[in-house]
Amino acid sequence: MKWKIKGFALVSSIAITTLLTGCTLGLNPFGEKEKMDPPDVNYVKNAKDLKNEVGKSKETAKSITTELYLVDKNGYVVPASLPLPNTQSVAKQAIEYLVQDGPVSELLPNGFQALLPAETVVKSIDVQNGIATVDFSKEFKNYKAENETRMLQSVVWTLTQFDSIGSVVLRIEGKPLTEMPVSKTPISNKLTRQIGINTETTQLADVMNSHPITVYFVASNKKVNYYVPVTRRVSNASSNDVVAVVNELIKGATVGSNLDSDFASDLALIDTPVVGNGVASLNFNQNLYTSLTDKNKTVSKKLIDALVLSLTENKAIKQVSVTVNGSKELTGEDGKPLSAPVSRPNKVNTVAF
């Protein structure tokens, strides 16, 4: 299979609520660009400006940025936000762009592939009461066994990015699927993000007395990075999922996983996190800083990004507020203060053309 690769940079923008920035992290996985331009930063100073910008985008936009869950060179299912043609059928189009050798071929970042078998037709998608029922053609069955779980994750996580979709029902030629065609993976009546993504099976064997949480680590190629969601199971005895998420991030990526983290092993919460009005407030020890001798009290951008992405997988959490020993005097790697709560970006790993 040959792909036409255009110049791109994968970016992830984390918005600081008081400024609504467009500040981005330059990411260019597996690309051959010799020099990376600094990311653009656009500040919206007030609600009137924001309204004007939104109106302008509606008038001129010929594309709509959509998260497609693709497979990377390490076999991870990864969100890549791509500019797709503007359409009223965004959910159907998103799944059509998961088909190998389809229209996504012109957009794929180097090293990424779509997962649905070539020539698969999305016959229909019906969204009712938060449930998306997807009917595929018979070509959906033409996949390798090792991609079965990845295919499920790709479809379910791509569709559930949309606010109107909470669960997914799969059909082939109008017939509901109760199991996948090749390796017979059982399928529940309604598939949600609870199926996990890039699930690590070695962490906890007791499935009945555990539940999934998803945390984000960093994959890199040379000097560029992008974020990879990983599902781990934690004991039901862990009643506080915010603490559980932080603990898993501190544990770090599994050895040999080709993933990385900026969380120090001696980093720790010094208070029980508080969640209220959509904001998770966390107070860490001084090991949150990139260096204990740094007078600017700098915090790694990769750490903040991974923390916010991981915690906001919980729909009750929209923003994350971070302090060190009770102090909000933190600085991002860009030199800007991190005193305000940080929001999840609208899209993750954006491919910029």
Ranges and model annotations:
Residues K2-F353:
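Bimodal "functional hotspot" detector
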